[in-house]
C-alpha cells in the first residue's frame, strides 16, 4: 500500500525547499513527465528521486533555520539582559527615592510650632553663627526679657519672642522627662540636633556680641535630645566641621557648623514656608530673622547642599496635597466669588441666570449646526456620484473606498443603506435616511412556518461579453434570442421562466457582460439565489468575469462555474480551473467546494448535468416562500413601449401578483392592467420566483426598485408622492454648481471644453450603462455633462432643452416622437441614434477629440544658402540663394540661420526666379528671396523654410 501512496507536489516543494520548475525539469530529465501544477500528485518513487537529488537543499534549509533560531535566541537573551538591567536601575532609583522620602517625612513632621519660635529668638542676636536657633530654646526658662532686648535692636521681633519663650518652657519639660516620646515624634528629633549644638557655641557667640545672653548655659540639659538625632548629624558633620574648626568645646558639636548653614533654613521661611530643620511653623519670627542673614545663609546652604539643603527641600515639598473634595470646594467658592453669588440682589441673580441660559442655548444651536454639517440626508439607493457630491469628496476616492470594502461599483451605481453608512463613516459623515418613515408605512407581515412552500430557484447567468451566456439560455429555452439582439450582445437584463423535463421550474436572469453594465450585473446578483458564471474555455478570466464573481461573492450567492465552448479545438478547461485556483476559487475537480461543469451551449453538451447541479444547490438552500399574501419583489427592467405604454419587467419574490392589484414601485404607482411572460403570453397570476412583464405603472420604474402591492390605492399614492418629493429634494442637493476653483482651473487650462448630452433610451438599464460610460470619458480638457436622461422616445421637450443648453441628443433604440424631428431640424439640433453601446461610446469619444485644440507640429520643407546680396532702393535687400535641400514655397514661413543660430523668424515677401514670381523653387535651383521686415542678411546665411501642421489630439 505504501507504494501506491501519492503526495501533492507543493508539499514536496516545501519539504525539499525547491521551486516547482526545478522539480519538474529534474523529473523530466529522468523521463518522468508531470504537470507544472502545484496541486499535481507524485508517487513515492518519484518523491524518493527528488529527495535523493535535492537532499542538500533540504539540509541547507534546516541549517538556515538553526542559524536563524540561534540568532533569535541570542537577541532574546540580550533583550532579557537589557530589560533586567533597566529593571535593576529602576528598583535602585525607587529605593533611593524612598529613602529620601523618609527623610523628608521626618523633616516635615519635625516642624512643631513651639520649637520654631524658640529658634528665632537666639538667631537674631547672633548674625554670624548658626548657634542662635539653639539659643532660642535655651532662654526658655532662664531670661525671656534679656533675649527680647537684643532682638529688638537687630530686628523688630520682640513681640513674637515673648510668647515663644513661654511655649518653649512647656516643650522642655516633656522633652526631658520622656525621651521615648521624642523618638516617636520625628519633629523633635529633627529639632534636637540643633539644640544640642547650640549650648556651647551659643555661649561663645553671645559673649562676642552680647554679654546678656550668657545665661543660656542652663539649656545645656537638652544635649540629651541632640544625641537622639546623631544619625542626622552624621550626614551633615563631615561638611560642617571644616567650616568652623576653631570653636572650643564643640569638637563633637558639628551642629554649630550645621547651624551656620542652617541659616538658609529661614530663607524658605521668608515667603512663609515652614522651616524644616528647626521645625518652626509660625511665620512671623522667621521672615524677620532671615533678613540679616540671607546673604551668608544662602552661601552656607549652597555649600552644605548634600546635608542641609536636603533638609530644606522636604520642607518645601512637604506640603500636603489637597484632597479632591478640597479642590472641588475651592473651585466652587472661587466661582461663587467670580459670579458674585450671595452678595447680589435677586434681580441681579435673575439677569445673570437669564444671560447664562441664553449663552447655553446659543452654544447648543452652534453645536447642532456643526454636527448637522457632518450629517447627510439621503434616500436609500443613492448613486456613488451623488454621495460623493454630498460629502464633497472626489468620486474616485468613494469608488476606491468601496473597492477596499470588497464592493465593485461605478459612478452611477446605486448603493444600499448598509453600504452607504459604511462609506460615509469612512469619510467622517453620518447618514440620515429620510425615507425611514415611508418604509415603515409599508407593513411587512411575518410568514408562519406552515404557510411556507418550496419555490423555484432564481438563477443569474453572468460572465464576460461573448462568452456564451445568452447562448446557454437559448439552448435551455430552445429559442434563438441572440438573433434579435443588436450586435449579438445582451444590453439589458432578460428574465425567463423555464420548466425542465422533470417538471421543476427555474427562473433565469440574463445579465449583460459588457463593461458598461456593471450596475446591471450587481442588480442581478442582489435578487438571485444562485449565480452561474459562464467562462469560455478558449479564452481567459476576463475583467468582467472577475467583476461578476466579486458581485456574487459580495451578495453571498453560491457560484457554479459553467466552462463553455469546450467543443472548440483550442479549448483548455484546465487552464481556466488553474486561473480560478489562483483567485482562491477551487472547483470540486481540484478538491474545492465550488461546483463547475464543462459545457457547450451550442451543441448542448453538459447542459443537462449543469441544470442538475443548479437544482442540487437549490435543494441545499431549501428555498421557501409564502404565496398566499400580497406580492413583493424587485423591478428588473423598465421601458416605454409605443403601443402599450410603460412596461416593467418584475420578479415576484414573495406572495402572488394578480391582475387588478394596486402596485407601488419606487416613486411610480398604478393598477396592474396586464401581465405577460417572456414569450408574450398573457399571465393571470404570478407566484414566487416568477418573472413577468407588467403594464399599468405611470412611469418607468428604476431597475432595482422594490415593489409592493397595496389594498388601499390612496395610501400607495401618498407614499409615491412623498418619494417623488424626496427625490426632487435630493436632486437639488446633488446638483453641482460651478465653483471659483473650477473657474480658475478652466482659465488656467485655457482650452477647456464642455459637451452637453441629453440621453434617451429604451430601457432604464441601458440608459444607466450609457450614462456611466459617457461620464467616464470626461477628461481635464473636455467634460461631458449629461443634463438629462430618461426612458422613452425623444420628445419636443428634449429638443427645446437641447436648444437652450446647446446639447446633442443621443437616442439608444428610440426615435423622435411627434413633431420632435421637425423641431430639431429647425433648431439645428444634432440627434444621433444607436442600437449598440460600443458605437455610441466610440462616436462620443471622437466628438470629444474633435473638440480638443489640435497640436501644432513644424515640418521643415527645405533650406537655401545665400550666395549674393542685392540692395535695391525703396525695396530693401534681396538674397540671391541656391536651394540646397527640399523646396522653398512662397507661402512657407522661414528662419534665417547664421552660424547655427536663428537670427530671424518671419515670412517671405517675394520668391522670384529670374524676373518671374514663382510658387516654389526646388533643390538645385537658384532664386531671389525677399524677407518681410528683415534686411540684415549676410552671405552664407541659411534660409530654412517650414510650415506648421495641425495634428489631431487624442484623449488621454
From Swiss-Prot:
It holds the Pfam family GTP_EFTU. Residues 600-602 are annotated as: G5. Its main location: cytoplasm. It comes from Flavobacterium johnsoniae (strain ATCC 17061 / DSM 2064 / JCM 8514 / BCRC 14874 / CCUG 350202 / NBRC 14942 / NCIMB 11054 / UW101). One of the essential components for the initiation of protein synthesis. Protects formylmethionyl-tRNA from spontaneous hydrolysis and promotes its binding to the 30S ribosomal subunits. Also involved in the hydrolysis of GTP during the formation of the 70S ribosomal complex. Residues 343-352 have a biased composition (Basic residues). This is Translation initiation factor IF-2. Residues 510-513 are annotated as: G3. Residues 197-208, 240-257 have a biased composition (Low complexity). Residues 53-102, 116-315, 334-371 are annotated as: Disordered. Keywords: Cytoplasm, GTP-binding, Initiation factor, Nucleotide-binding, Protein biosynthesis. One of its GO terms (cellular component) is cytoplasm. Belongs to the TRAFAC class translation factor GTPase superfamily. Classic translation factor GTPase family. IF-2 subfamily. Residues 142-158, 209-229 have a biased composition (Polar residues). One of its GO terms (molecular function) is translation initiation factor activity. NCBIfam families: IF-2, small_GTP. InterPro entries: EF-G-like_DII, IF2_II, IF2_N, P-loop_NTPase, Small_GTP-bd, T_Tr_GTP-bd_dom, TF_IF2_bacterial-like, TIF_IF2.
